[in-house]
Swiss-Prot record:
This protein's encoding gene: asnS
Keyword Ligase attributed: yes
Quaternary structure annotation from Swiss-Prot or TrEMBL: Homodimer.
Annotated keywords: Aminoacyl-tRNA synthetase, ATP-binding, Cytoplasm, Ligase, Nucleotide-binding, Protein biosynthesis
Disulfide bonds: none
Catalyzed reaction equations: tRNA(Asn) + L-asparagine + ATP = L-asparaginyl-tRNA(Asn) + AMP + diphosphate + H(+)
Keyword Cell membrane: no
CDD domains: AsxRS_core (cd00776), EcAsnRS_like_N (cd04318)
Parts forming coiled coils: none
Superkingdom to which the source organism belongs: Bacteria
Protein name, UniProt field: Asparagine--tRNA ligase
GO cellular component, one term: cytoplasm
GO biological process, any: asparaginyl-tRNA aminoacylation
Length: 463
């Protein structure tokens, strides 16, 4: 008999009612008495489990009644509609085959476990409700983002993981080497001889696919990357991970306003898609993780995003009378408390802050006519503050070279990036969305470690 997914049974119960079906999955819960028992069976296709009713008519009734949690079974039985019960249907088992026994020391027992404990068993945590919901939403959200760009004719570019340049100029990068660390070759000055390494020069894990994406935007017009990025930032916080995923579109013949419009459209599209395609999971998050999740998402979807310059924002904050931990003055990088005040108290909706001081932004951002600010934007949202950062890129070769020199960066590392301005360069712009930060926002999960299947953080590379 062909296997039927539990999702299909829930989505089209009337079609299956009265039919004999085969389902297979893992035992989430089992209750039994002398003559009958109930199994909560989850097959991974759907957030909810299906209730299996079994009784002494089964040849192996006693064996089934003693099965440990997480044992895998294959069940044949009749679908019976139960409109008055908690679940819309159940399956009356006619046959249950044991596929794989679980040991009795299975760590996920019936009690509720803390997220901290579940991180120590990351290989088993997707079997819990919270992480089943989280990682299905992660999958659905990723698909939504791809679909958004594909529907608009964007080309998906696979940018390199190993790179010879530092996009952000931050220097917090993971080095890549095949050198024998017990016998590293040195040059005449006693420095590591990079020419003897695999690539013949210093290489690192990428912090962003943006520079490579710019090259392809100047050929395909509209492109995006969606891939892993790495930061060797020794921050043990709930918001930082050493490995995370970035969504980075790049559009040619575009200015800052165009990229803000794209940001707003993408965010609303992805949120609507998740609400439509993961209703059970989103209801779970709203009930058990963060009771403001649905309200927050609907606020984003139904709002026209605000816009304010950095200079105006500083003035608003200074005149607000609010007691901030970090003093507000022109030139500071806005702190989370400032960002949240603007989005929650002033605008009460998402807001783009634009035209930041050049000294707190990256070298590739277009210098404004005032010589002090750059055409950059951060999208601030109620609940967390900054969600997305974007900018118009500097298309003028001479200005870009000056910025690279001003920041003490090695111009030679960026020769190819500069050449893009030499051969038919044009105005172009893009943004970066930390995918995990987006997931934290829409699920209410408070720690980045809980929205990545196997998180990589300082001192932690288990699994």
């Amino acid at each position: 008999m062909e296997n039927t997914l539990v999702k299909s049974l829930y989505r089209d119960t009337d079609k299956y009612a009265g039919q004999t079906v085969q389902v297979s999955g893992w035992i989430r819960n089992l209750r039994d008495s002398k003559a009958f028992g109930f199994i909560e069976l989850n097959d991974g296709s759907f957030f909810k489990s299906v209730q299996i009713v079994f009784d002494t008519e089964l040849d192996n009734f006693k064996e089934i009644a003693k099965l440990p949690l997480s044992s895998s079974v294959k069940v044949e039985g009749k679908v019976i509609a139960t409109p008055g019960a908690k679940q819309p249907f159940e399956i009356k088992a006619e046959k249950i085959d044991i596929e794989g026994l679980s040991d009795s020391d299975y760590p996920l027992q019936k009690k509720r476990h803390t997220f901290e404990y579940l991180r120590t068993i990351a290989h088993l945590r997707p079997r819990t409700n919270a992480f089943s919901a989280t990682f299905r939403v992660r999958s659905i959200a990723a698909f939504a983002i791809h679909q958004f760009f594909q529907e608009r004719g964007f080309v998906h570019v696979h940018t390199p993981i190993i790179t010879g340049s530092d996009t952000e100029g931050a220097g917090e990068m993971f080095r890549v080497t095949t050198q024998d660390l017990n016998n590293v070759p040195k040059d005449e000055d006693g420095q590591v001889d990079e020419s003897k390494d695999f690539f013949g020069k210093e290489t690192n894990l990428t912090v962003s696919g943006q520079l490579n994406a710019e090259a392809y935007a100047l050929a395909f017009r509209d492109v995006y990357t969606f891939g892993p990025t790495f930061r060797a930032e020794n921050s043990n916080t709930t918001r930082h991970a050493a490995e995370f995923w970035m969504v980075e579109p790049e559009i040619a013949f575009a200015e800052l306003g165009d990229v803000m419009n794209l940001t707003e459209d993408m965010l609303k599209y992805a949120m609507k898609y998740v609400l439509e395609h993961a209703p059970e999971e989103m209801e779970f998050f709203n009930s058990f993780v963060d009771k403001t999740v649905l309200e927050r998402m609907n606020n984003v979807i139904n709002s026209d995003f605000g816009r304010i310059t950095y200079t105006e924002a500083i003035k608003v904050l200074q005149e607000s009378g609010a007691d901030f931990k970090y003093p507000v003055e022109w030139g500071i990088d806005l702190q989370t408390e400032h960002e949240r005040y603007l989005s929650e108290e002033i605008f009460k909706r998402p807001v783009f802050v634009t035209d930041y001081p050049k000294d707190i932004k990256a070298f590739y951002m277009r210098l404004n006519d005032d010589g002090k600010t750059v055409a950059a934007t951060d999208l601030l949202v109620p609940g967390i503050g900054e969600l997305i950062g974007g900018s118009q890129r500097e298309e003028r070769m001479d200005v870009l070279v000056d910025r690279i020199k001003e920041l003490g960066m090695n111009e030679e590392d960026y020769w190819w990036y500069l050449e893009l301005r030499k051969y038919g360069g044009t105005k172009h712009a893009g943004f970066g969305l930390g995918f995990e930060r987006f997931l934290m926002y829409i699920t209410g999960m408070a720690n980045i470690r809980d929205v990545i299947p196997f998180p990589r953080t300082p001192g932690s590379s288990e699994f």
